[in-house]
Amino acid sequence: MAEVIEHLAISEDHFLETITGKVMKAPPRPKGEDEDVKKIDEFVIANVPDRTSKFKAPEPIAPKNRFGSPEASLKHFLESRERSIAFLKKTEGLRDHALESPFKNKFDAYQWVLFMTAHSERHTKQINEVKADAKFSKA
């Protein structure tokens, strides 16, 4: 479970850096791809949290005990989430720019935010699965 929490903390930073440093600076989505926006939104919301497919974390966001403890990882995640929320509160035009995603579609910044939150939901489900396992030590 500690590795999942660390992965979430690293991922939150990675998503925000991608959105602010790349997506918001990318060109607009090409004409003709606008009709795909709703389909992509729905795809992200339906598929990213789905735990029936398993994936290995890419190397840059793989857990490596960067924070020293699960508590420190959680603290970092919460601080990163606050930065994400602050960015969203002050930023307009999330649909105005699009960048290639891991799914081979271009995601606009709004869709990257959907991806970030759906990714958190996926791993929250994973944590709950671990906690529900009879072998999980509650001590």
Question: Locations of the language-model features?
Answer:
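Acidic/histidine-rich alpha-helical segments that form the ligand environment
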Residues: I40-R95
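Short, contiguous alpha-helical
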Residues: M1-F43, K89, G93-A139
